[in-house]
Design a protein with these regions (language model features):
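Lectin-like carbohydrate-binding module/patch detector with strong preference for beta-trefoil
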Residues: 1-159
Length: 159
């Protein structure tokens, strides 16, 4: 596997965690579980690097593919309806793995542009970190200005 520059995909609004919330695999770093749904989690970049379970191939995002190269999987819509979760599958360029990353930060499935990748309003504590890491669920909800703090995303590497 060639080296890919990886970036975090993070909520532009930090909400209640100064480290920010990043799209994250369930489980810890290299031991993350590809069979579990994606979530958002305190971003790990404060530790000095992009973590493998939050590291997306920056070159593929512009083509609408959210690829985690360490695990060789892509973000996929679980089912084509509002409140769908986001799962991980082998990358196959199927429409369920194609997203539009709009200039304002909204991430929409190509087949359903009325839905936006959304972090949940409620949160829970994770297993580690000081202060403790926070987790929010990730799903597709109707794009709505009142949810903008939980629907507008950016990408960043570690400077």
């Amino acid at each position: 596997r060639g080296f890919a520059e990886t970036v975090e995909v993070y909520l532009l609004n930090n909400l209640n965690d100064t480290r920010g919330f990043c799209i994250d695999m369930t489980g810890y770093k290299t031991n993350a579980d590809v069979n579990k749904a994606l979530q958002t989690h305190s971003c790990y970049s404060y530790q000095g690097s992009v973590s493998v379970d939050q590291g997306f191939d920056v070159s593929k995002i512009s083509n609408g593919e959210f690829n985690l190269p360490f695990f060789n999987v892509c973000m996929e819509v679980e089912n084509a309806e509002s409140s769908s979760g986001l799962i991980l599958r082998g990358c196959d360029k199927s429409p369920k793995q194609q997203f539009v990353f709009e200039d304002d930060g909204k991430i929409k499935p190509i087949n359903d542009p009325g839905l936006c990748l959304t972090a949940s309003g409620d949160y829970r504590e994770g297993g580690g970190g000081s202060p403790v890491h926070l987790i929010r669920d990730l799903s597709l909800l109707v794009c709505d200005a009142s949810f903008s703090t939980r629907q507008n995303w950016g990408v960043r590497s570690v400077n």
